[in-house]
Amino acid sequence: MTQRLVYRKNPDFPNRYISPEKLFFYLQANYSDHIQKVGQSFLEKPIFNLRMGNGKIKVLAWSQMHGNESNATHAMLDLLEIFKHQPELMHQLFSKISLDFIFMLNPDGSEKWTRRNALDIDMNRDFLKLSSKEFRVLKKIAETGSYNYALNLHEQRTIFTTDGENPATLSFLSPAADHERTITETRKKAMAVISRIYENLKSEIPNQIARYSDEFYPTSTGDNFTRLGIPTILYEGGHFPNDYKREGTRKYYTIALYEGLQAISELNGSTENWETYKQIPENKETHFDVIYRNVKLNTDFECILDIAVQYKEEILDGED
């Protein structure tokens, strides 16, 4: 009988904010045999790669390319915690795949809780210019590692919904490699993985899984990795109902990460059932955090309107 993954939260990282120093200490203390420093940031913070598994299918993943998107880092930390309690799942998975997981690609932005790096560069739009020291680390690893799949792990704002009512707690994308958005074999391989994730999670978070727009961006990471022939799966963690700390998102992001790796281990380049990808509803940008209805303005004439508010997430000094 196949054992199912039982979600566990990593107790060492209870909060949304993750200090780079705390993360580095944790990895060195607990996974010294699996981590390697692969580069450093503009402010000379280390960038670590965690390597697990000896399978033939090679997977590259990275978290916090945008410093204020910590859910993917949490997801991998939670998955490591789960594997402590369910080692058979770990052994089964990593007998088929080899995973290189780059933790916190943007440690400078992660420390300050900013999307961009210390030079105010959005690394997800830096593929052609290569202006950021950190992105050059990722690009070199991707181009020399002979990877079969890549996982580009991000978060999205609370504005996204699947149907105008439910939030898009998770969104996925197989990025296009051209303006025509041609569905190539490389894209189909990524779509097949996303389809497996969707089928396995849609009953747990019904109407909360969406498909991100596949508009082509010539300078973005996923689009160019697809052009290189690497099937790339974009993860976007979004809002979970009544949960601005994204604890629910964290849970299902972790499960989706595992399901994605498991799907890769089983598909091994197959495009089986890739068409299911088209059944996933597209993201819609229609949500706000708060809407004040029928607000009467203090004007010389009668003016009544609705005011929509979008929250801005900030980290306060002394809090994490």
Please place each PLM-identified region on the residue numbering.
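Short beta-strand-to-loop junctions in surface cap/lid or active-site-entrance loops
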Residues: F48-K56
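Single, functionally critical "micro-switch" positions that shape active/binding sites
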Residues: L43, S63-M65
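Short glycine/proline-enriched loop/turn "hinge" motifs that connect secondary-structure elements
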Residues: M52-G53, W113-R115, N224-I230
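Conserved beta-strand scaffold positions in the cores of enzyme catalytic domains, especially
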Residues: I35, N49, F101, A150, ...
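Active-site/substrate-binding loop(s) of hydrolase catalytic cores
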Residues: K56-K58, M65, S70-N207
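C-terminal accessory segments enriched in acidic
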Residues: M1-Y17, G145, L173-D320
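Short glycine- and acidic-rich boundary segments immediately preceding or forming the N-terminal edge
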Residues: M1-I47
